[in-house]
């Protein structure tokens, strides 16, 4: 359905509930969700959302993901205090990836770094590009 927007003019749109019903969640009921800082365009992290996480995020304005490792909803910042507030939701041209433009409070990464993308390929080495902003033990406790 989202493909209908490929030839649409700016300002044209589709009904959200109809689009939501046609999103191509994978066999586990998930879509990839990229979090990006809304005012700097910094890419913060990649996580997954099921329909319930997506609906909760839109309802509350606080980003909620689905944790594949725990098999449950994961409300970003619930234990660390490093919450993400949704500024804008975008869908890619196929509707199979979400872009969450957020206001990130503190580090986004569980390592205490601002972004999960701190490993940079330089030649034949993967180099750490930034130090943690916060000690992970401070974020999550012992």
UniProtKB/Swiss-Prot annotation:
Mg(2+) binds at residues 92, 94, 96. PANTHER family: HISTIDINE BIOSYNTHESIS BIFUNCTIONAL PROTEIN (PTHR42945), HISTIDINE BIOSYNTHESIS BIFUNCTIONAL PROTEIN HIS7 (PTHR42945:SF1). It is found in: Cytoplasm. This is Phosphoribosyl-AMP cyclohydrolase. The lineage of its organism: Bacteria, Pseudomonadati, Pseudomonadota, Gammaproteobacteria, Chromatiales. It is an enzyme of class 3 (hydrolase). Pathway: Amino-acid biosynthesis; L-histidine biosynthesis; L-histidine from 5-phospho-alpha-D-ribose 1-diphosphate: step 3/9. It comes from Halorhodospira halophila (strain DSM 244 / SL1) (Ectothiorhodospira halophila (strain DSM 244 / SL1)). Binds 1 Mg(2+) ion per subunit. Binds 1 zinc ion per subunit. One of its GO terms (cellular component) is cytoplasm. InterPro entries: PRA-CH, PRib_AMP_CycHydrolase_dom, PRib_AMP_CycHydrolase_sf. The gene is hisI. HAMAP family: HisI (MF_01021). Disulfide bonds: none annotated. Belongs to the PRA-CH family.
């Amino acid at each position: 359905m989202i493909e209908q927007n490929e030839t649409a003019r700016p300002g044209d749109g589709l009904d959200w509930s109809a689009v939501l019903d046609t999103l191509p969640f994978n066999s586990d009921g998930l879509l990839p969700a990229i979090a990006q800082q809304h005012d700097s365009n910094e890419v913060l992290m990649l996580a997954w959302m099921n329909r319930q996480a997506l609906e909760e995020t839109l309802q509350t304005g606080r980003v909620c993901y689905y944790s594949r490792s725990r098999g449950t909803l994961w409300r970003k910042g619930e234990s660390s205090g490093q919450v993400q507030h949704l500024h804008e939701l975008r869908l890619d041209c196929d509707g199979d990836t979400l872009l969450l433009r957020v206001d990130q409070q503190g580090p986004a990464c569980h390592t205490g770094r601002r972004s999960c993308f701190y490993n940079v390929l330089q030649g034949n080495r993967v180099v750490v590009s930034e130090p943690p902003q916060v000690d992970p033990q401070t974020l999550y406790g012992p």
